[in-house]
C-alpha cells in the first residue's frame, strides 16, 4: 500500500464527522448512496441481500456495510486509511458477520480468494481508481449474476484543485456503460439523483450485474 495514499486518506478521515445515531426515520442503521442525509434511494438498489456475501470498497466507518449485515448479509469492508478500520471495528466489531480490513482496493482484490455476490462503493475506491485496472479485478471476484453498485458526483459537478484532477475518474453515463460492459458486466443502469432543495450537486448511481 502506498504510504502517500494512506496518509492522504488519513487526513481526509480526520475531518469526517461520525454518522448520527439515528436518521430522519428514527432508524439506527441505514444505507445512504448520496452525500446528503436522508436523501436518495436505500439498499433496495442491491436487491435482496440476506444470505449474500458483500464487499464494500472504501467502507469508511462501516455504517453502510453494517446495515446490510443487519439485513442478513455477511460483509467485508476495506479502506485504505488505518484509522477507518479502527473506527469501524469499535462501532460494529461486535456485529456477527462483518469484517473490516485496512487495504488498498487493487491490492486486496489481487490477493483475494473469496467470491462476492454484491460489491458496492459509495464515493469510494471506484471513483478513485482507474476502471481499466479495477473493474477486471472486481469482476474476477464476483459470482455470476452478482450486483455491482457505486455512487459518486456526476462528472463536471465539482471543480478540482490544481494537480488533483487525476485523482477522480469521472465518466459520463454512456462511458460507464461502455466500460462496464467491456469488463464483463451487463444490465448497466445509471441514475442521476437530483440534490435536495438549496443544494446544487447531485449524485450519479450506477448498478450492473456480473455477466
What are these regions (language model features)?
Residues 132-147:
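A short glycine-rich, Lys/Arg-flanked "PGG" loop and its adjoining helix->strand segment in the class I
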Residues 110-119:
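A short acidic, Gly/Pro-enriched loop at the edge of an enzyme's catalytic core
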Residues 118-132:
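A short SAM/SAH-binding and catalytic strip from SAM-dependent methyltransferases
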Residues 48-49, 113, 135:
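A short, aliphatic-rich alpha-helical micro-motif
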Residues 186, 192-211:
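Core SAM-dependent methyltransferase catalytic element
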Residues 55, 60-108:
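Class I SAM-dependent methyltransferase SAM/SAH-binding core
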Residues 1-50, 63, 147-175:
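Conserved class I S-adenosyl-L-methionine
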